[in-house]
């Protein structure tokens, strides 16, 4: 029975197949004439098409099944994705854009999660922007930057947060062209409860900033997506693929961010394509100008266009695929449309002066600090006569007015600048004369014979020096200089000596008051040096008339007494007696006046301290460190002062006194510091008046050859003989090593050893003194960890092994801070700058570890590493261990001061062995531990072989 049913079933199946093929044959015949192939739609494909229809991803099937030649269905697909299946009735042949037959294509189907939509790198940004709105209120705000821009996200609790304000202060007006050249766009998030907000800062090709407010509802989504921690400041740098390239828990300098970006291979292509971009951007003149924009949906894609470009972009996208040049031409033509309204300009112009003023202030600061970093130190030779530094006349009057108080008011009336030629010709005179300064205040007292001889010798030589140079110097010399030794005496001065000795002169020209005219002042100044010079001759001339007057007075007295005795009884001679009495009184007055003039001069105060007296108080007792500096704020002096103040105890055990002379040669002040032990009696060598005595200071300068206005330092032994000259600041360790070789010091050390005198640093070292030890001399690499068993800390230590030479040549000092709570400590590792592998280690006390962590705001709870430059500023933060020091070396070698060091080291042949990086260094780092650095690291190999060490 079953075998009979088999043929019937086969017959029915064959008939069904024939009928089915007959119904489709007309469609096949009609399509065969046109040469068009009809896609076979299977039940499986129809199901997938239905699935795509629901998910909105049916672009691949729709292309192969569209019917109309016009782009009308293409527009409909933008709004509502529709799936069209093949119909047997009407099939006109579709053509491409230029009449080319369209080839069907099938696209892979994937799930469209929110995270994959952000990282979708297969489809173009244009298609992605059609599917998702990308305005500042859209949840897909990051999608507008994908493939075109790098995104710099700054997250802070609120706008007044300290780190946020510090980071924004680093964003000066002149940095936005650099940011635009690297295709960087900014997103600022404020996430504190109740103050959620933010803004999107788009940087145009002209450096202009277009700010759009950010929807507060997007803040939590962006925070969770970027894994940003609430309540703390943090920054994230995203690649063009929207992958995280670097995280920064603290503000960093833009150079560190540029360094990270410039390491990528795509950045090299950008540099080639954008040559001269920064110059053109800055030439536009609108760099740093902020334009406030509203919240628009289509404003997300125009990353570097103007506001008009962003608003006009969606209508353009509904058309056929544009070429690369078309949007740019339209952008330039449409950018002028939002310009006519004056309101944006009125709102954006007021902030501009504020920002420029801030930038100017910061520049002044940097220029003032820069000479310390780029000072080319002079050679060790001492050209005594040629090193005459010019000094400004306008800076002298205030200091001179303080020192020479008697002449201050009158001298200040004669302020006039010297001509440049005259000033240059007078420099040798100005540096030679102060050494011969005499006490011009001794016109009321008779000075010792030694001073008479010196002043007479000065006057004797000046009589024959009335040449062109002396005339010029007398007419144009700085009026604030000490008048005594500087004014040469003219040949007519001896004729004025009688006038100088008279009482009328002293009455008219009171030294405590200023004179009425400039001519009288010059006459008074000229008379003072000649007075001291001629005192001996004056006294001799005075003695002769005094003796004659005395003889006449005695004879007159005798005659008058005889007459009074003989004619006492005669009344007619009373008138004669009265006349004689009057004559007696007159004679007595003249005798008293003549006798009082020399005695008054002898009763004047004693002369001021001389150089011999000053040095005599130090001889055999103290060693001297004499320093001259133009001003107290001089950078070289500040370095040297900080250096010896840190070694107080060592200075005291070596019995060193520091004599510091401030100011120019002709107007200086002095300060003396004695470093003594506790059991020594405090020393007081000079009075306060002697510290501003120009004669004493000039003689001290002359004694040790410190006769020019520059930093200079002299070291003496206890015999006060010069042992060493220094023209630049020097480390006190080398000074102490030199002193310990003195014979007198060897005896002192033996004596101190017997008495048990040792250096005990009982004072707690302050943070300022600790950091000033490294300023402009060393770079600090600070590593902080909760304990020495921390995994990140141990990984970082393994990366530091074998890097002593590189650290030394780059002047790096490692500071390790360990511990939490009260159990904290630290170690300071000093590497020699010559590249040797010897490391000096010093313990850091607990209180200093806490101060350093507080100063740099480093948490003791987790690992952290930061690089501090020679200027004391933090250059970069590293929240995770650096398995290779390449990034740190690249950052340091890009600094200007480091380039100067490299040039010096190259000339000296200082370099590190090439095999130092074997195992993990430059050549193996490109296998890397991070996806962002796996691109290409050949530039590290070129760095290794290209630099001289």
Curated annotation (Swiss-Prot):
Keyword Isomerase: no
Induction or repression: Up-regulated in adipose tissue of obese BRS-3-deficient mice.
Biased segments, Basic and acidic residues type: 112-123, 308-328, 419-429, 463-477, 499-510, 534-548, 556-581
InterPro entries: DUF4174
GO MF, any single term: glycosaminoglycan binding
Residues bearing glycans: 467
Compositional bias (Low complexity): 345-380
Keywords attached to this entry: Coiled coil, Extracellular matrix, Glycoprotein, Isopeptide bond, Phosphoprotein, Secreted, Signal, Ubl conjugation
Superkingdom of this protein's organism: Eukaryota
Tissue note: Expressed in brain, stomach, colon, rectum, liver, lung, kidney, adipocytes and testis.
Regions of compositional bias (Basic residues) in chain numbering: 487-498
Biased composition (Polar residues): 436-445
Localization in the cell: Secreted, Extracellular space, Extracellular matrix
Extent of Gly residues compositional bias: 295-307
Family: Belongs to the CCDC80 family.
Its biological purpose: Promotes cell adhesion and matrix assembly.
Assembly: Binds to various extracellular matrix proteins.
Protein name: Coiled-coil domain-containing protein 80
Naturally occurring in which organism (per UniProt): Mus musculus (Mouse)
Biological classification of the source: Eukaryota, Metazoa, Chordata, Craniata, Vertebrata
